[in-house]
Amino acid sequence: MESAKKLALTAALSQYNKVLVAFSGGIDSTVVLDAALKTLGKENVLAVVANSDLFTDEEYTKAMDLAQEMGATVLGTTLDYLSNDDIKNNRASSWYWMKKMFYQKMNELKDNSNCDVVLDGMIMDDKNDFRPGLRACDEEGAVSVLQVANIYKSDVRDMAREAGLSNWNKVASCSVSSRFEYDTELTVEGIQRVMKSEAYLRSLGFATVRVRVQNKLARIEIMADQINDLVAQMFAINDKLQEFGFDYVTVDLEGFKSGRMNESLTADVKSALVD
C-alpha cells in the first residue's frame, strides 16, 4: 500500500497536464522528477538543469546524465548570477536574487515549452530555515509539490530508496557563494579556489565538506567524526590548499554545519529578507 504522503504527492501532480521540473540532481528534485514521470508520463514532463559559475560543471553534468537515465526529456540552461551586483557582492539579499533569476528563467522555459507550471524540490524542512528563496518562489508562481504533500527530508530519503533512485543517499550541495562572508565580492578566481579545494578534499574521502573563506584563510568544515582523519593528513592538505592560493588553512572544530555564514545575520535582517 502506498503511503499517505506518496498519494498526496501523486494528487498534487495530477492536477497538471504538463510540468517543468527544475532539476538539480539532488535527492529532493529527483523524487519530484520520478513522481512526475510516473504520474504524468514522459511526454508531459520536462526536466531543466541550470549551470552557472556558482556550481561545478561536474554537478551540472551529473544532473543532466541522471535526468536522461530516468527517462526524462532534459534541457540545459545557463544563468549568469554574477551579472547581478547583489549576488556578485554577496549581499545578504543574494540568495533571494539568485532564486529570483532562477525562477524567472524557469518560467521563460516553461512558457516556451507549453508547460503548466514550474515545480521545484523545496521540502517542509526549508520552511523552518533561513530560505529567502521561498519568497522568490512564491513571487514567480513556482510550486513546491513536496511541501504541498507535507514531505520532509526523512520522507524524501525513504521514498528515493524505495523507488530505487541511485542518489537516495546523495550528500546535499549548495551554491559556492555560501562559502564566502557576506559583503565580500565573488570573483571567478576565488570561486575556483574553493571548488578545487573541496574537490581535493572529497577525493580524500570527506564527502560532506565546505571550505569557508575569510580573506585568504580557508576554514574547513567536515563531519565532526572525521576530523581526526583530516588531522592525520594535515600537512598534505595544508600544502595542497596553499597551492590553490590560500595563505592559511584551518579546521572548524565544531564540524560541518549547514548555513554557517548566516549566523552573522541579525534576526531583523533575516526577517526583512523572507517576509
Predicted regions, residues:
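ATP-dependent adenylation/nucleotidyltransferase module used to activate substrates
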Residues: 1-136, 141-162, 203, 218, ...
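AMP-forming adenylation/ATP pyrophosphatase catalytic core
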Residues: 131-163, 167-275
